[in-house]
A protein has these predicted regions:
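Primarily recognizes the serine-hydrolase "nucleophile elbow" in alpha/beta-hydrolase
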Residues: 122-199, 217, 222
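C-terminal catalytic histidine-bearing segment of alpha/beta-hydrolase fold enzymes
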Residues: 41-43, 56, 117, 236, ...
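Short beta-strand element of the alpha/beta-hydrolase
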Residues: 64-73
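N-terminal cap/lid segment of alpha/beta-hydrolase-fold proteins
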Residues: 22-62
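Acidic catalytic loop of the alpha/beta-hydrolase fold
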Residues: 194, 240-244
Length: 318
């Protein structure tokens, strides 16, 4: 009898605890059953040949009309899916943003240029394709990336008007007809320069090879590709980052200024490369809130429960 009583008490207590459940949905970006026969330039039909996204939906009580495609880093040879993927999705979900974590093709899967760019462009188009169903405003779809993923995000924001790099015989579908321009960019310690001493050589080699032609190096030097249509951008770096020095971000920020693109950049004194949300790193740990306030002040997000697009005042930094 005592055991039964304890079990009853345990069930009652646990039933009173708050339940946090995040709905997720995996979407293969090019369905092999579709007319295009799978991802362009696919080397096979294994999972590694099928770029996909995991959609993290916020709780309906806080959901707003904004979505962001997240590109984890990894030097174009791996993907940091936890601290630059899952944790970022959970953070965005907390204030209502639908988050789409992209698992793009990279060198250790056998892929380089142009496939990562094709994958992020397809991811942005896929979000627009599902915007109605997911409750997303088609003009509030951004892209965020870390390190090499930040480079990929920057190419999404600078090459959306280019002719797509589809192979001969590729059959475009309804998703391909949509715009792949992100409405905003968040670039976290991104690789930007491919033709300077400050580049991350491993990312460059994995994407375009060691002996890439000058034209391709320049194509992927994102600071040289900024135009008047490049989206508003938030950038952060740390001064102690020796893997991807902040000169990368400075070059991109100055290019944005030359084209009158709204931009904000933070260089924190402390912190190594690859911090993700930077929890537990004094000073640098404020970047997520600074980013949230920037998104709020530029009208890309709103406070949950506010039914119009008024820009609310920033909350006190913690």
């Amino acid at each position: 009898m005592p055991n039964r009583l304890l079990l009853t008490i345990f069930i009652l207590l646990t039933s009173m605890l708050p339940v946090f459940s995040v709905e997720q949905q995996k979407i293969i970006l090019w369905d092999s059953d579709a007319t295009n026969g799978g991802a362009p330039n696919a080397l096979g039909t294994e999972d590694k040949d099928k770029p996909h996204v995991t959609v993290w939906f916020p709780d309906k009580d806080v959901a707003i009309e904004t979505a962001v495609v997240v590109c984890p880093g990894g030097g174009y040879g791996a993907l940091a899916l936890d601290h630059e993927g899952r944790q970022i999705a959970e953070w965005f979900n907390a204030f209502g943003v639908t988050t789409i974590v992209l698992e793009y093709r990279h060198r250790n899967k056998g892929y380089g240029h142009p496939n990562p760019l094709l994958d992020v462009q397809r991811a942005i188009r896929t979000v627009r394709f599902h915007a109605d169903t997911w409750g997303i405003a088609p003009a509030k779809i951004g892209v965020l990336g870390f390190s090499a993923g930040g480079h990929l995000a920057s190419t999404a924001g600078t090459h959306f008007d280019d002719p797509p790099h589809f192979p001969e015989g590729y059959a475009a579908d309804a998703i391909d007809a949509l715009s792949c321009r992100p409405d905003f960019m968040v670039l976290c310690y991104p690789v930007i320069q491919f033709d300077a001493a400050a580049t991350h050589r491993g990312s460059q080699n994995n994407l375009i090879g060691q002996d890439a032609p000058k034209e391709l190096v320049e194509y992927y030097s994102s600071e040289k590709q900024v135009t008047d249509r490049t989206p508003p951008t938030f950038i952060f770096f740390t001064d102690e980052d020796t893997a991807v020095p902040p000169e990368n971000g400075v070059a991109f920020y100055l290019a944005l200024r030359r084209h009158n693109i709204p931009a904000e950049m933070h260089i924190f004194q402390k912190g190594a490369h690859g911090l993700g949300l930077a929890q537990g790193h004094p000073g640098t740990e404020h970047w997520p809130e600074l980013c949230r306030v920037w998104l709020l002040n530029n009208g890309f997000i709103r406070e949950p429960g506010v039914l119009d697009d008024r820009i609310m005042g920033p909350q006190q930094l913690r």
